Amino acid sequence: MISSNDFRTGTTIELDGAVWRVIEFLHVKPGKGSAFVRTKLKAVVSGSVVEKTFRAGEMVPQALLEKSKLQHTYMDGDEFVFMDMTSYEETRLTAKQIGESRKYLKEGMEVNVVSWNEKPLEVELPNSVVLEIKETDPGVKGDTASGGTKPAILETGAQVMVPLFISIGEKIRVDTRNDSYLGRETQ
Protein backbone atom coordinates (compact mmCIF):
# COMPACT_ATOMS: atom_id res chain seq x y z
CA MET A 1 0.00 0.00 0.00
CA ILE A 2 1.14 3.53 -0.74
CA SER A 3 -0.22 6.81 0.58
CA SER A 4 -1.57 9.29 -1.97
CA ASN A 5 0.80 11.83 -0.33
CA ASP A 6 3.74 9.73 -1.59
CA PHE A 7 2.67 9.75 -5.26
CA ARG A 8 5.45 10.76 -7.66
CA THR A 9 5.66 10.74 -11.44
CA GLY A 10 6.23 7.12 -12.48
CA THR A 11 4.64 5.54 -9.38
CA THR A 12 2.56 2.47 -10.31
CA ILE A 13 -0.70 1.66 -8.52
CA GLU A 14 -3.48 -0.92 -8.81
CA LEU A 15 -7.04 0.29 -9.38
CA ASP A 16 -9.99 -1.86 -10.47
CA GLY A 17 -7.71 -4.80 -11.27
CA ALA A 18 -5.48 -2.82 -13.64
CA VAL A 19 -2.02 -1.26 -13.38
CA TRP A 20 -1.84 2.54 -13.65
CA ARG A 21 1.21 4.81 -13.80
CA VAL A 22 1.07 8.32 -12.30
CA ILE A 23 2.05 10.77 -15.04
CA GLU A 24 1.03 13.98 -13.22
CA PHE A 25 0.08 14.80 -9.65
CA LEU A 26 -0.83 17.92 -7.69
CA HIS A 27 -1.30 18.27 -3.94
CA VAL A 28 -4.18 20.70 -3.31
CA LYS A 29 -4.89 22.33 0.06
CA PRO A 30 -8.10 24.36 -0.29
CA GLY A 31 -9.00 27.10 2.20
CA LYS A 32 -12.03 25.09 3.31
CA GLY A 33 -12.22 21.33 3.55
CA SER A 34 -9.54 18.70 3.56
CA ALA A 35 -6.51 18.41 1.30
CA PHE A 36 -6.56 16.13 -1.74
CA VAL A 37 -4.28 14.87 -4.50
CA ARG A 38 -5.33 15.39 -8.13
CA THR A 39 -3.65 12.90 -10.47
CA LYS A 40 -3.45 12.00 -14.13
CA LEU A 41 -3.07 8.23 -14.52
CA LYS A 42 -2.10 6.20 -17.59
CA ALA A 43 -3.10 2.54 -17.94
CA VAL A 44 0.08 0.53 -18.52
CA VAL A 45 -1.69 -2.08 -20.68
CA SER A 46 -4.13 -0.03 -22.79
CA GLY A 47 -2.44 3.38 -22.68
CA SER A 48 -5.68 5.21 -21.82
CA VAL A 49 -5.35 8.30 -19.62
CA VAL A 50 -7.78 9.29 -16.84
CA GLU A 51 -7.87 11.95 -14.17
CA LYS A 52 -8.59 10.81 -10.62
CA THR A 53 -8.70 12.60 -7.28
CA PHE A 54 -7.61 10.95 -4.01
CA ARG A 55 -8.05 12.21 -0.45
CA ALA A 56 -4.75 13.26 1.13
CA GLY A 57 -3.28 10.28 2.95
CA GLU A 58 -5.59 7.75 1.25
CA MET A 59 -3.94 4.34 1.04
CA VAL A 60 -3.86 2.78 -2.44
CA PRO A 61 -2.46 -0.65 -3.43
CA GLN A 62 0.91 -0.25 -5.11
CA ALA A 63 1.55 -2.36 -8.21
CA LEU A 64 4.84 -4.20 -7.79
CA LEU A 65 6.32 -4.55 -11.25
CA GLU A 66 9.15 -6.93 -12.05
CA LYS A 67 11.86 -6.01 -14.55
CA SER A 68 13.82 -8.70 -16.32
CA LYS A 69 16.64 -8.21 -18.82
CA LEU A 70 15.74 -10.00 -22.05
CA GLN A 71 17.17 -10.03 -25.56
CA HIS A 72 15.01 -9.31 -28.62
CA THR A 73 15.66 -12.37 -30.79
CA TYR A 74 13.22 -12.17 -33.72
CA MET A 75 9.77 -11.20 -35.04
CA ASP A 76 7.05 -13.83 -35.38
CA GLY A 77 4.31 -12.25 -37.46
CA ASP A 78 2.99 -9.35 -35.36
CA GLU A 79 4.74 -10.53 -32.19
CA PHE A 80 8.15 -9.60 -30.85
CA VAL A 81 9.98 -12.56 -29.31
CA PHE A 82 12.37 -11.98 -26.40
CA MET A 83 14.64 -14.52 -24.73
CA ASP A 84 16.03 -14.72 -21.21
CA MET A 85 19.70 -15.45 -21.91
CA THR A 86 20.17 -17.42 -18.65
CA SER A 87 17.14 -19.74 -18.77
CA TYR A 88 16.51 -19.56 -22.57
CA GLU A 89 12.83 -18.96 -21.83
CA GLU A 90 10.89 -17.07 -24.53
CA THR A 91 8.53 -14.16 -23.88
CA ARG A 92 6.22 -12.77 -26.56
CA LEU A 93 4.87 -9.23 -26.74
CA THR A 94 2.50 -7.74 -29.31
CA ALA A 95 3.26 -4.58 -31.27
CA LYS A 96 0.57 -2.80 -29.19
CA GLN A 97 2.33 -3.74 -25.93
CA ILE A 98 5.65 -2.47 -27.25
CA GLY A 99 4.15 0.76 -28.60
CA GLU A 100 6.54 3.53 -29.65
CA SER A 101 9.54 1.53 -28.41
CA ARG A 102 9.46 -0.58 -31.58
CA LYS A 103 11.02 2.17 -33.67
CA TYR A 104 14.33 1.66 -31.83
CA LEU A 105 14.12 -2.10 -31.27
CA LYS A 106 16.46 -4.26 -33.33
CA GLU A 107 17.35 -7.94 -33.14
CA GLY A 108 20.00 -8.78 -30.56
CA MET A 109 19.24 -5.72 -28.41
CA GLU A 110 18.92 -6.23 -24.64
CA VAL A 111 15.96 -4.48 -23.00
CA ASN A 112 14.05 -4.57 -19.73
CA VAL A 113 10.66 -6.27 -20.00
CA VAL A 114 8.27 -5.07 -17.28
CA SER A 115 5.91 -7.74 -15.90
CA TRP A 116 3.04 -7.72 -13.41
CA ASN A 117 1.75 -10.99 -11.94
CA GLU A 118 4.12 -12.81 -14.33
CA LYS A 119 2.36 -11.22 -17.34
CA PRO A 120 4.61 -9.07 -19.59
CA LEU A 121 3.28 -5.52 -19.94
CA GLU A 122 5.81 -3.33 -21.74
CA VAL A 123 9.41 -2.86 -22.86
CA GLU A 124 11.84 -0.35 -21.37
CA LEU A 125 14.57 0.66 -23.80
CA PRO A 126 17.98 1.93 -22.72
CA ASN A 127 18.14 5.76 -22.60
CA SER A 128 20.28 5.80 -25.74
CA VAL A 129 20.93 3.37 -28.60
CA VAL A 130 23.45 3.21 -31.45
CA LEU A 131 21.87 2.84 -34.89
CA GLU A 132 23.03 3.16 -38.49
CA ILE A 133 21.78 5.83 -40.91
CA LYS A 134 20.00 4.14 -43.84
CA GLU A 135 18.65 7.17 -45.68
CA THR A 136 19.37 10.91 -45.59
CA ASP A 137 20.16 13.76 -47.94
CA PRO A 138 23.82 13.81 -49.00
CA GLY A 139 26.16 16.21 -47.23
CA VAL A 140 27.46 19.19 -49.19
CA LYS A 141 30.99 20.59 -48.86
CA GLY A 142 30.86 23.33 -46.27
CA ASP A 143 28.19 21.65 -44.13
CA THR A 144 30.01 21.85 -40.84
CA ALA A 145 28.73 22.21 -37.33
CA SER A 146 26.77 25.32 -38.30
CA GLY A 147 23.69 24.22 -36.42
CA GLY A 148 21.51 23.11 -39.33
CA THR A 149 19.69 19.77 -39.28
CA LYS A 150 18.12 17.40 -41.78
CA PRO A 151 15.85 14.32 -41.43
CA ALA A 152 17.43 10.87 -41.43
CA ILE A 153 15.89 7.39 -41.44
CA LEU A 154 17.62 4.82 -39.24
CA GLU A 155 18.05 1.06 -39.78
CA THR A 156 14.94 0.37 -37.66
CA GLY A 157 12.76 2.81 -39.63
CA ALA A 158 12.80 5.57 -37.01
CA GLN A 159 13.20 9.13 -38.23
CA VAL A 160 15.38 11.64 -36.35
CA MET A 161 16.85 15.05 -37.12
CA VAL A 162 20.64 14.93 -37.56
CA PRO A 163 23.32 17.58 -38.31
CA LEU A 164 24.01 18.35 -41.97
CA PHE A 165 27.45 16.64 -41.96
CA ILE A 166 26.04 13.15 -41.14
CA SER A 167 25.90 10.77 -44.12
CA ILE A 168 24.44 7.36 -45.01
CA GLY A 169 26.15 4.40 -43.34
CA GLU A 170 27.36 6.29 -40.26
CA LYS A 171 26.44 5.06 -36.80
CA ILE A 172 24.90 7.60 -34.44
CA ARG A 173 23.73 7.59 -30.82
CA VAL A 174 20.04 8.51 -30.37
CA ASP A 175 18.17 9.41 -27.16
CA THR A 176 15.15 7.05 -27.06
CA ARG A 177 13.20 9.29 -24.65
CA ASN A 178 12.91 12.31 -26.95
CA ASP A 179 14.09 11.05 -30.38
CA SER A 180 17.09 13.38 -30.44
CA TYR A 181 20.55 12.99 -31.98
CA LEU A 182 23.27 12.68 -29.32
CA GLY A 183 26.39 12.26 -31.44
CA ARG A 184 28.43 10.12 -33.81
CA GLU A 185 29.49 6.69 -32.66
CA THR A 186 33.08 5.82 -33.53
CA GLN A 187 33.98 2.14 -33.54
From Swiss-Prot:
Its main location: cytoplasm. It is found in: Cytoplasm. Keywords: Cytoplasm, Elongation factor, Protein biosynthesis. SUPFAM superfamilies: Nucleic acid-binding proteins (SSF50249), Translation proteins SH3-like domain (SSF50104). GO terms for biological process: peptide biosynthetic process. Pathway: Protein biosynthesis; polypeptide chain elongation. Pfam families: EFP, EFP_N, Elong-fact-P_C. Disulfide bonds: none annotated. One of its GO terms (cellular component) is cytoplasm. InterPro entries: Elong-fact-P_C, NA-bd_OB-fold, Rib_uL2_dom2, Transl_elong_fac_P/YeiP, Transl_elong_KOW-like, Transl_elong_P/YeiP_cen, Transl_elong_P/YeiP_CS, Transl_elongation_fac_P. One of its GO terms (molecular function) is translation elongation factor activity. Involved in peptide bond synthesis. Stimulates efficient translation and peptide-bond synthesis on native or reconstituted 70S ribosomes in vitro. Probably functions indirectly by altering the affinity of the ribosome for aminoacyl-tRNA, thus increasing their reactivity as acceptors for peptidyl transferase. Belongs to the elongation factor P family. PANTHER family: ELONGATION FACTOR P, ELONGATION FACTOR P (EF-P) FAMILY PROTEIN. This is Elongation factor P. The lineage of its organism: Bacteria, Bacillati, Cyanobacteriota, Cyanophyceae, Synechococcales.
